[in-house]
Amino acid sequence: LVGVLEGEILIQNHCYRGEEMAIMLDIAKEFNYKVTTFHHAIEAYKVADILADNGVCAAMWADWWGFKHEAFDMVWENAAIVDQANSGTGCAIIHSDSAIGIQRLNQEAAKAMAAGNRAGFNILPSRAIKWITSNPAKALGIADKVGSLEAGKMADLVIWDGNPFSVYSKTEKVFVDGLLLYDKDNPSTPKATDFELGIINSQENRL
């Protein structure tokens, strides 16, 4: 609790409903701590301005809701509304707690971007890419290390052969901490340790 009150521990709050998010922010103000992100924020669009005013991110699915009572009232434009709140100062994150969805998180972001654009929000790809890069890094408190391409950061990078939001684009290269771990044109590229696949590299080659 001391770490929370002193700001050393970032609060990641699981919360579906808009009024519950507002209540949690009131409690945070009362006890002088900060909520960093609301996760599974189905109704974030209802309190998007409040979230933006308080510098709070909302981690949302692109198009999944209705699976239980408190997850009923979402809209397709949820991420776009959060992103564009208060003149575009909102912090939207597209996430997935599914082992399947996480493999195509770029396409999940593309779906949310398309929904926002259909509603007239004019979400640019350069904005939507932040939903799965710099905004999550901000929420985790590691934006000084990852999330964008800047000198001094860890150089985690994917190079695509086309639009990263397209279902037709394929990965050409993957760098982690500046190290080339995948090269489509070079099958001999050393693979990272993956215990599920039984790939175990020597200690000096591990990340």
Where are these regions (language model features)?
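His/Asp/Glu-enriched, well-ordered alpha-helical/loop segment
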Residues: L10, D49-A52, V56-W160, S169, ...
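Extracellular/periplasmic ectodomains of large secreted or surface enzymes and adhesion receptors
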Residues: V176-L207
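Small/polar (Gly/Ser/Thr/Ala-rich) solvent-exposed segments
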Residues: P164
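Polyanionic/metal-chelating signatures
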Residues: L1-H39, K170, V176, S202-R206
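Active-site environment of divalent metal-dependent phosphoester hydrolases
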Residues: G18-A22, A41-A48, G101-Q103
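A general structural motif
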Residues: N13-R17, H39-E43, H69-W76
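Short active-site-adjacent structural elements
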Residues: V167-Y168, K184
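Distinct, well-ordered alpha-helical segments
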Residues: M21-A28, V47-A52, A109
